[in-house]
């Protein structure tokens, strides 16, 4: 009997730092290892029939971590985009980001916008990365937008 795989898979990227700490390594080593696994998953997903992949990569709560860890995570995101952009585009992967970009480094924001534009018409795999994202934060931002629109009579 063959297994039916879902067309949309969501992964909460949690535990990489703890995994590394439990092995006596720096937390960022775990985050780098997690990014390597993501690369493998993104490559395999389309061949498995998965069309949508959502990665919850950095929540609004992650800002509470040490400055070193936050900066390290942002560097890993930037390096991933930089190293994988060509391969993703050639493989037909559309990459999008959700979450509040306003706190992110402007250079990272430009990189994100660039890869989104470059891969916009592709559809072999729809890769969505949630960065600076939180369900509660998303609701608050949506309500604020609605309130602003109502105040303007829209």
What are these regions (language model features)?
Residues 1-154:
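Flexible, compositionally biased loop and terminal segments
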